[in-house]
């Protein structure tokens, strides 16, 4: 692959389409964002507060746009178009690893500040649930499980960004109480222990999702909306995926086996199938993630009604937007290896006129709703609910290919081949860890995950 070689000190602490009534419900929950005491008197108030958490996760500073783009800038996925703009300048500094510039610290500071605001809001909800004195709540376990899962998730993301890889050195503050007092920093090891404690409790509380989250997905329950759209909630399978991530990243004795166990539980549940047959083609890959939570592969995503506007300024401006650092990253030099349909994630947009398309040139289109960009592209309308993906099942297939490579190479190859065949590539007879790395690099463009893989693997340069 062609990538700009830049020395990186990895140990640096870096700062849908559903019935109208259902869409109306999703729109209304998208607005729940302010926690007030008056909310915590009935289930409607609690659920409004819960939806407020997801609104924050989908904010522009977090998974709505900036956080994945920042991570991709660090991972050298991106290059800048003809002109730098105020919008792009901070990311440009990150691509050059100027972490201490004012623009860089502003971007990192936005994640840190809003991340801890989210954690504070979670703790506020948990405090009220723990002291609940009103009519019993039918979904108390779901509420608490989702809160604990979100708290662990946000702390783990902050730890991966800002904490030391050395378990005995400074991590981040792990805040598990609501209040104005200052929480001291924990070591990285202590942070992992607290993340796992929250995730294990969440796992127990969310076991109802074994029946609520099925494949094919259940119809919307109009009488109990909170148990619908479970892939848009912190659900049991998202917690399993996070447990797998955390164990693999910590990498203490026995952790790889634990990561493998949880990854297998998700993949073998068959609730998040990869495309097969006629679905393995350009049309599917143009539509599957274009501003939507992947309908089948999405384990957890955030509903967000303004996905297009949040991403258009980053990737579709004529001047000053980000381009792919390697436009040929999906190219297979040997035709016998098949056609990687993910190549449709970097393409010339179908604009209103050929002249406009030519001006734009090759663009990062994986997350762009082509039917909003040009209403004539109706056949390219996305599949699924409008929003952002946070966890998708390919990560678990590739994790299994990595963790089983030495102990169970036949199984590792099976999971790897299932994955690459779903992308249009022909199966392999043997694989290496570098093959898995390459597929992860190809798969997680624009999702902010590849940088974390590099950091975990302690890669000295990219």
What does each model-identified segment do?
Residues 130, 134-139, 204-235:
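Acidic interhelical loop/turn segments
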Residues 22-73, 304, 462:
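Membrane-proximal, proline-rich intrinsically disordered regions
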Residues 95, 233-234, 248, 256-389, ...:
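Hydrophobic-face positions in mid-chain alpha helices that act as interaction patches
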Residues 194, 429-462:
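Long, intrinsically disordered, low-complexity segments
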Residues 1-31:
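Bacterial Sec-dependent N-terminal signal peptides
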Residues 88-162, 181, 185-190, 199, ...:
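Conserved, well-structured interaction surfaces
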Residues 50, 119-122, 192, 199, ...:
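Inward-facing hydrophobic residues that define packing positions of alpha-helical scaffold repeats
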Residues 159-166, 210, 249-253, 406-408:
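Short coil/turn linking the two alpha-helices of tandem helical-hairpin repeats
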């Amino acid at each position: 692959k062609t990538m700009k070689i830049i020395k990186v000190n990895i140990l640096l602490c870096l700062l849908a389409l559903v019935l109208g009534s259902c869409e109306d419900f999703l729109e209304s929950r998208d607005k729940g964002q302010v926690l007030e005491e008056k909310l915590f008197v009935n289930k409607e108030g609690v659920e409004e507060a819960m939806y407020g958490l997801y609104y924050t996760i989908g904010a522009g500073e977090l998974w709505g746009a900036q956080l994945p783009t920042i991570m991709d800038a660090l991972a050298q996925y991106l290059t800048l178009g003809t002109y730098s703009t105020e919008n792009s300048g901070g990311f440009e500094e990150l691509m050059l690893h100027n972490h201490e510039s004012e623009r860089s610290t502003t971007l990192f500071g936005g994640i840190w500040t809003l991340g801890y605001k989210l954690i504070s809001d979670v703790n506020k909800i948990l405090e009220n649930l723990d002291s609940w004195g009103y009519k019993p709540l039918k979904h108390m376990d779901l509420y608490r499980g989702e809160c604990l899962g979100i708290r662990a998730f946000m702390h783990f993301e902050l730890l991966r960004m800002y904490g030391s890889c050395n378990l005995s050195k400074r991590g981040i503050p792990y805040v598990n109480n609501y209040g104005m007092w200052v929480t001291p920093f924990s070591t990285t090891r202590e942070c992992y222990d607290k993340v796992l404690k929250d995730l294990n409790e969440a796992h127990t509380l969310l076991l109802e999702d074994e029946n609520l989250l099925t494949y094919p997905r259940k119809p919307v329950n109009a009488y109990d909306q909170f148990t619908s759209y479970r892939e848009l909630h912190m659900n049991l399978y998202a917690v399993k995926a996070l447990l797998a991530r955390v164990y693999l990243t910590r990498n203490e004795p026995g952790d790889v086996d634990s990561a493998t166990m949880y990854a297998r539980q998700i993949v073998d549940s068959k609730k998040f199938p990869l495309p097969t047959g006629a679905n393995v083609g350009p049309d599917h890959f143009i539509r599957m993630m274009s501003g939507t939570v992947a309908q089948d592969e999405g384990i957890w995503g955030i509903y967000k009604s303004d996905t297009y506007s949040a991403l258009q300024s980053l990737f579709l401006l004529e001047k000053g937007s980000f381009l792919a650092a390697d436009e040929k990253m999906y190219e297979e030099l040997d035709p016998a290896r098949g056609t990687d349909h993910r190549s449709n994630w970097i393409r010339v947009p179908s604009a209103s006129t050929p002249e406009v398309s030519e001006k734009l040139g090759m663009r990062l289109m994986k997350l762009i709703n082509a039917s909003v960009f040009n209403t004539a592209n109706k056949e390219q309308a996305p599949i699924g609910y409008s929003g952002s993906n946070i966890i998708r099942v390919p990560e678990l297939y590739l994790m299994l290919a990595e963790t089983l490579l030495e102990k169970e190479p036949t199984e590792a190859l099976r999971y790897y081949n299932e994955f690459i065949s779903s992308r249009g590539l022909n199966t392999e007879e043997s694989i290496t860890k570098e093959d898995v790395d390459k597929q992860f690099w190809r798969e997680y463009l624009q999702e902010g995950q590849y940088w974390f893989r590099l950091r975990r693997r302690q890669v000295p340069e990219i």
